[in-house]
Amino acid sequence: MADLKQFAEQLVNLTVKEVNELATILKDEYGIEPAAAAVVVAAGGGDGAAEEAQTEFTVVLKDAGASKLAVVKLVKELTGLGLKEAKDVVDGAPSNVKEGVSKEEAEGLKKSLEEAGATVELK
């Protein structure tokens, strides 16, 4: 039992590079697709490199603020949603405005929405 706890401790403390190497070994030598490898990193392993390596972001509308109509129009324009769908996104805050976007696009969306009076968070 102590060996398993020690193994678990080592697994949780792997760096992102080490997790990638482990994934390659599991795939190449054992034919195992390590879909859960990212879970180990997300569980707190590594040295914070997981945050630096993030390439896709989600733009989350926390609050529309006082200019709700302007935010609805902007969400409609930025996402290509219809007016009703954009209104539903704004009314349902906190809600995801756009998912899986690059850092640059996410920051641009955040800036635009904040200029319209909304409170926005990037995840």
From Swiss-Prot:
Q: Describe its assembly.
A: Homodimer. Part of the ribosomal stalk of the 50S ribosomal subunit. Forms a multimeric L10(L12)X complex, where L10 forms an elongated spine to which 2 to 4 L12 dimers bind in a sequential fashion. Binds GTP-bound translation factors.
Cited PANTHER family = 39S RIBOSOMAL PROTEIN L12, LARGE RIBOSOMAL SUBUNIT PROTEIN BL12M
Q: Write down the SUPFAM superfamilies for this protein, in alphabetical order.
A: ClpS-like, Ribosomal protein L7/12, oligomerisation (N-terminal) domain
Q: Which superkingdom does the taxonomy of this entry point to?
A: Bacteria
Q: Which GO terms describe its molecular function?
A: mRNA binding; structural constituent of ribosome
Looking at the UniProt entry, the stretches that span the membrane are none
Keyword presence, Iron:
no
Which GO BP terms sit in this record? translation
Q: Which organism is it from?
A: Flavobacterium johnsoniae (strain ATCC 17061 / DSM 2064 / JCM 8514 / BCRC 14874 / CCUG 350202 / NBRC 14942 / NCIMB 11054 / UW101) (Cytophaga johnsonae)
What keywords would UniProt list here? Ribonucleoprotein, Ribosomal protein
Q: One GO CC annotation, please?
A: cytosolic large ribosomal subunit
Gene name on record? rplL
What does the sequence similarity comment in the record state about its family?
A: Belongs to the bacterial ribosomal protein bL12 family.
* Region described as Disordered: spans on this chain: 96-123
Q: Which function does this protein serve? A: Forms part of the ribosomal stalk which helps the ribosome interact with GTP-bound translation factors. Is thus essential for accurate translation.
* NCBIfam families, A to Z: L12 (TIGR00855)
Answer whether the UniProt record assigns the keyword Ribosomal protein to this protein.
Answer: yes
Q: What is this protein called?
A: Large ribosomal subunit protein bL12
Compositional bias of kind Basic and acidic residues? 100-114
Highest lineage ranks of the organism? Bacteria, Pseudomonadati, Bacteroidota, Flavobacteriia, Flavobacteriales
